[in-house]
């Protein structure tokens, strides 16, 4: 798709009747949005076809003019998709570029298309349609990522690994349980996407500049034709509203934060020091100087894109925060933020799904690490509560002394002699050793939502029925 970016001071704008001279070259440059809003060409044409069809149905334009308009718009769609359309900066935006070309193709009938319509409701329509499609893509990509995690969780429902708090070993869990935590996160993201689709499912076309129109239009007809549930209810709010864009960016930002947390774990876990996973060659790169390197660049780039997405959200919030009703030109700056965030989110979700499916899980390294850091200390305290009748706070104190002794001796809890344990508390018996293995610890966590393999499988089954 070619673009004419020449500076000009000629006045051939479609709003130029009130002006005696054309805009300055720098005004054209700052005012033009065609460099980015040409991305909305398909939505703009789709909306114009629906609008023209409604105008003819209502007797506002003739059927003959409607047919010319629809034919011309379809020709323009083909030209753009074939890369044969020249976009002009002096025509400002996608709406006026298409309308100008339509006038070239069909003559005066093109001038009837904008009857009962403003660029204010036109751009609101185009942008809503585009965001709706992007939300549907995000829903599909999140579903794919959830499916990848469900498969890994099922495969590793019994694979023991260390669970962490403060990035310090806390308690043994299973890798399947850890995977299911991300299923919950991304499941919430997907639910937010679905709610956002419901929220924006109202057609803005017909609100005109801000006050509605005196023509006998049928907004319900265009809403139905464009796949919306209903038209918006207040014309001032309709052209002022960018909540749908802010909601998209909010969802993208939350999803990106989840992706970033996951990416951080992938980066850490793939280091030789952890060695919990091995990334496939397909999602790694090498070094230009160090032949041995295998870098987790895909995960790092996913982590970095979170900054871009969060920045887009803050940018649009700041753009919108002081705008009086209804439309202001500031709102032209909304699209680049959403376009960039949508592209970043799509890349990040697809890359992460590939990494999760392709990575090798090193169960032996996970299990070896699971017992480090006295990870079964809580099991020892729970045993003292159950078997010796100690209040939990007393059991916590006794266990702390046992941990200190093991640390002093440089051994695991299970390696301490019984006499050393009994010297700390006489109620301790040899039965204590039965709860000090990581396998026993994991198996005991049978509470709803816990890490015991059977509980993990219940979680997987629940999600299988909803994915």
Swiss-Prot record:
It is an enzyme of class 4 (lyase). One of its GO terms (biological process) is arginine biosynthetic process via ornithine. Transmembrane segments: none annotated. It is found in: Cytoplasm. The keyword Zinc does not apply. Pathway: Amino-acid biosynthesis; L-arginine biosynthesis; L-arginine from L-ornithine and carbamoyl phosphate: step 3/3. Keywords: Amino-acid biosynthesis, Arginine biosynthesis, Cytoplasm, Lyase. InterPro entries: Arg_succ_lyase_C, Argininosuccinate_lyase, Fumarase/histidase_N, Fumarate_lyase_CS, Fumarate_lyase_fam, Fumarate_lyase_N, L-Aspartase-like. It catalyses: 2-(N(omega)-L-arginino)succinate = fumarate + L-arginine. GO terms for molecular function: argininosuccinate lyase activity. GO terms for cellular component: cytosol. Its EC number is 4.3.2.1. NCBIfam families: argH. Belongs to the lyase 1 family. Argininosuccinate lyase subfamily. This is Argininosuccinate lyase. The lineage of its organism: Bacteria, Pseudomonadati, Pseudomonadota, Alphaproteobacteria, Hyphomicrobiales.
